[in-house]
């Protein structure tokens, strides 16, 4: 395997490319990126054969900001014959044995979506052939590598594999969430996805439990508050604007008509702080830092808008600065994670946990 294939949001190829170049260099693995704007994927071609599999194993997917999914891939397969696309694909996968799952995918672009029906239909005969040849186990296994076949154009595909313990559980790394009919805005999906992505399933009952107190800075009309309320939390919603009437009728929301940058919580028993304000990312980060230094929350989820040209570098700088500020203020035990989630647009979601091993 000579290529590392990374799925990303269309328009963010440059950021994804910059990040993987940086991370590969940290491992002393040489290579170069190949990408085109709005392709929704990046190829990092290694100088040494086999290095792509090393990257796919050693670089944790959750540590990458802009990549939704990645897999080690062979050289691009071109001009696959319409009457037999399977044979060249199986030849390319000859050294992949006993994989646990097959995913036939496309990049997340409007043009590529036209191939989704083909991919779905093509999966059935390809899966059977791979099972018969021993490339794929007879029964799916979540502990074995995942075979990926990604059609980037008609008759053109990258094939390879990802490690099941370092891979998104979703095809192309995209969770399919439903918009609740009573949610005040589509922004609600961002926090829903953030909770799914950052909070392990086995810890949700403890860390997203009914009766917790939360604060939503810049809450109106209540998209993020909605996700807290539906999990049974009591929310202080901070915004000068109007809140959704349905949320207010739950009795779980107290609306403070105030500036989120000036608000100080009257009670200090807050577990969750969430914030999705259209503001300079550095200013939002400084606000979260202030709340952390004051000890006003235990876990926080917030978005940083990305109007900058050098988005990867700027986000990295903001996160590094936050870590430095927390340490300088005697906050030693914390965890910062960041991801460009599917429901994010020109923004990233940051998760900050104080004393991450102490959940109460």
UniProtKB/Swiss-Prot annotation:
The active site is at 305 (proton acceptor). InterPro entries: RlmM_FDX, RlmM_THUMP-like, RNA_MeTrfase_FtsJ_dom, rRNA_MeTrfase_M, SAM-dependent_MTases_sf. One of its GO terms (cellular component) is cytoplasm. Its main location: cytoplasm. The keyword Hydrolase does not apply. One of its GO terms (molecular function) is S-adenosylmethionine-dependent methyltransferase activity. It is an enzyme of class 2 (transferase). It catalyses: cytidine(2498) in 23S rRNA + S-adenosyl-L-methionine = 2'-O-methylcytidine(2498) in 23S rRNA + S-adenosyl-L-homocysteine + H(+). Disulfide bonds: none annotated. The keyword rRNA processing applies. It holds the Pfam family FtsJ. One of its GO terms (biological process) is rRNA processing. Keywords: Cytoplasm, Methyltransferase, rRNA processing, S-adenosyl-L-methionine, Transferase. It is found in: Cytoplasm. S-adenosyl-L-methionine binds at residues 187, 220-223, 239, 259, 276. Its EC number is 2.1.1.186. Belongs to the class I-like SAM-binding methyltransferase superfamily. RNA methyltransferase RlmE family. RlmM subfamily. HAMAP family: 23SrRNA_methyltr_M. NCBIfam families: PRK11760.1. Catalyzes the 2'-O-methylation at nucleotide C2498 in 23S rRNA. Monomer. This is Ribosomal RNA large subunit methyltransferase M. It comes from Shewanella sediminis (strain HAW-EB3). The lineage of its organism: Bacteria, Pseudomonadati, Pseudomonadota, Gammaproteobacteria, Alteromonadales.
